Swiss-Prot record:
E.C. number(s) listed in UniProt: 4.6.1.17
Gene: moaC
Binding partners and assembly: Homohexamer; trimer of dimers.
Active site: D132
NCBIfam families from the UniProt entry: moaC (TIGR00581), PRK09364.1 (NF006870)
Superkingdom assignment: Bacteria
Listed HAMAP family: MoaC_B
Protein family per UniProt: Belongs to the MoaC family.
The protein, known as: Cyclic pyranopterin monophosphate synthase
UniProt-recorded Gene Ontology molecular function terms: cyclic pyranopterin monophosphate synthase activity
Length: 162
C-alpha cells in the first residue's frame, strides 16, 4: 500500500483544477465499500419497519436509487472519471435501539482508476432516498457517517477505515 500523497491529485503545479490522467495506468480489479446511516425518530422508524408497510418499498427504492447514482457518478462529480461498473450492491441493516438504517454500498470494476466515488455516491443517494420517503413522519432525520470503509486494487493497494 502506498503512503498518502503530499499533494492534491486534482490540482496541477500552478494550483489549477485538472482531471487526473489515467491513460498510462493499467486496468486492474478494484473494489470500494462505503457506509452511511440514516437516524430518525421512533414514529418514522416504526412506519418504516412496520410489517406490510414501508420497509420493503422504501429500502428497495433506496437500493435502485443507489445503483442509478453510482452509474451517474461522473455526471455529478466534476473531475470523476466515467468507468465501467462490474457490480453495484447495496445492503441495509436496521438498529431498533437507535432508530437507524445503516447503508452499505459496494462497487467493483476492472479499470484504471478506483470506484471510491461511486460507492460513496451510492451510499449517499440511498440515504437521501430514505430521507425523502420518510420525511413526512420526521423532518429532523439525520444522515450521518457517510464514509469510505474499504478499498482495494490499483497502485495504492488495500485500505481500511479502522
Amino acid at each position: 500500500m502506498s503512503s498518502p500523497s503530499p499533494a492534491l491529485s486534482h490540482l496541477d503545479e500552478s494550483g489549477q483544477i485538472r482531471m487526473v490522467d489515467v491513460g498510462a495506468k493499467s486496468a486492474s480489479d478494484r473494489i470500494a465499500i462505503a457506509r452511511g446511516a440514516v437516524r430518525m425518530n421512533a414514529l418514522a422508524y416504526g412506519l418504516l419497519t412496520q410489517p406490510g408497510q414501508g420497509k420493503g418499498e422504501v429500502l428497495n427504492t433506496a437500493r435502485v436509487a443507489a445503483v442509478l447514482a453510482a452509474k451517474r457518478c461522473a455526471e455529478l462529480i466534476p473531475l470523476c472519471h466515467s468507468l465501467p461498473l462490474a457490480f453495484v450492491g447495496v445492503d441495509f441493516s436496521l438498529d431498533d435501539a437507535t432508530h437507524t438504517v445503516e447503508v452499505r454500498a459496494t462497487c467493483r470494476t476492472h479499470y484504471k482508476t478506483g470506484v471510491e466515488m461511486e460507492a460513496m455516491t451510492a451510499a449517499s443517494v440511498a440515504a437521501l432516498t430514505i430521507y425523502d420517503m420518510c420525511k413526512a413522519a420526521d423532518k429532523g432525520i439525520v444522515i450521518e457517517q457517510i464514509r469510505l470503509e474499504y478499498k482495494a486494487g490499483g497502485k495504492s493497494g488495500e485500505w481500511r477505515n479502522d
